[in-house]
């Protein structure tokens, strides 16, 4: 069972439908016990970083996520959920993140030929093969964001060209992040979610 974390700031239902489509049993929950017992979790997110992090902390889910990461269970952050995995953000004001992947969230450069927010389809360039990227090569995915993950190159597994090379996917051990929306990216998004399903299966096998 995989849990999609519900903290009133994410597109949980569309992610759940995508997981149903690939045959991955899932549940939307904000219950800390259910989340801790899950085989893997997805952290969605839309909106502003400070409010999202505040809500996670208020519910005690920041500690739960860190415990899950320490236990080696897979985590996938989507859009703002990916950004929350990093150490901090300067959106509106400095805010500490979960610190599960090194890096800092910054606003995209405001240049006349590159609109902010970055919205729509953009090509994904694979930098490192992982279970989530092994079946994709140069396809297009769907983005909606104004901030990006400024993190060390070693943790970036895919990028998309814009005013800068945007880290489209990041990874640290069993922790993954997608800046774009896999659940809105058609077949390629489903392939990425299938890759996360494989990570969960592999982790369960190794823990038995």
From Swiss-Prot:
Q: What is its EC number?
A: 4.3.2.10, 3.5.1.2
Key word Ligase present in the record?
A: no
User: Which Pfam families does the entry link to?
Assistant: GATase (PF00117)
Task: Please name the catalytic residues of this protein.
Answer: 79 (nucleophile), 181, 183
Is-annotated flag, keyword Lyase? yes
Q: Where is the Glutamine amidotransferase type-1 domain?
A: 1-206
> Which coarse location class applies to the principal site listed for this UniProt protein?
cytoplasm
Query: Which key words are in the record?
Result: Amino-acid biosynthesis, Cytoplasm, Glutamine amidotransferase, Histidine biosynthesis, Hydrolase, Lyase
Which one of the record's GO molecular function terms can you name?
glutaminase activity
Reaction catalysed by this enzyme: 5-[(5-phospho-1-deoxy-D-ribulos-1-ylimino)methylamino]-1-(5-phospho-beta-D-ribosyl)imidazole-4-carboxamide + L-glutamine = D-erythro-1-(imidazol-4-yl)glycerol 3-phosphate + 5-amino-1-(5-phospho-beta-D-ribosyl)imidazole-4-carboxamide + L-glutamate + H(+); L-glutamine + H2O = L-glutamate + NH4(+)
Q: Name one GO biological process term.
A: L-histidine biosynthetic process
Instruction: Quote the InterPro entries the UniProt record gives.
Output: Class_I_gatase-like, GATASE, Imidazole-glycPsynth_HisH
Question: Which PROSITE patterns would you find in this protein's record?
Answer: GATASE_TYPE_1
Cellular component (GO) terms are:
cytoplasm
- Specify the pathway: Amino-acid biosynthesis; L-histidine biosynthesis; L-histidine from 5-phospho-alpha-D-ribose 1-diphosphate: step 5/9
Location in the cell reads: Cytoplasm
Share what the entry says about its subunit structure, partners included.
Heterodimer of HisH and HisF.
> What task does this protein carry out?
IGPS catalyzes the conversion of PRFAR and glutamine to IGP, AICAR and glutamate. The HisH subunit catalyzes the hydrolysis of glutamine to glutamate and ammonia as part of the synthesis of IGP and AICAR. The resulting ammonia molecule is channeled to the active site of HisF.
Q: What is this protein called?
A: Imidazole glycerol phosphate synthase subunit HisH
Designated gene of the protein? hisH
């Amino acid at each position: 069972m995989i849990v999609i974390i519900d903290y009133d700031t994410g597109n949980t239902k569309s992610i759940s439908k995508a997981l149903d489509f690939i045959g991955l049993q899932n549940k939307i929950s904000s219950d800390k016990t259910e989340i801790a017992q899950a085989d893997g979790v997805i952290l969605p997110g839309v909106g502003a970083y400070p409010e999202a992090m505040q809500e996670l902390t208020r519910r005690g889910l920041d500690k739960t996520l860190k415990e899950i990461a320490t236990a080696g269970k897979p985590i996938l952050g989507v859009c703002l959920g990916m950004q929350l995995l990093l150490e901090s953000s300067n959106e509106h004001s400095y805010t500490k993140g979960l610190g599960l992947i090194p890096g800092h969230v910054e606003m995209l450069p405001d240049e006349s030929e590159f609109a902010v927010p970055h919205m729509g389809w953009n090509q994904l360039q694979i930098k490192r093969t992982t279970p989530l990227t092994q079946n994709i090569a140069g396809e297009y995915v769907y983005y909606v964001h104004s901030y990006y993950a400024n993190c060390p190159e070693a943790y970036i597994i895919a990028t998309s060209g814009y005013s800068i090379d945007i880290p489209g996917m990041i990874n640290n051990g069993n922790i993954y992040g997608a800046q774009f929306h896999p659940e809105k990216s058609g077949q390629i998004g489903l392939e990425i979610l299938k890759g996360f399903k494989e990570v969960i299966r592999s982790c369960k096998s190794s823990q038995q």
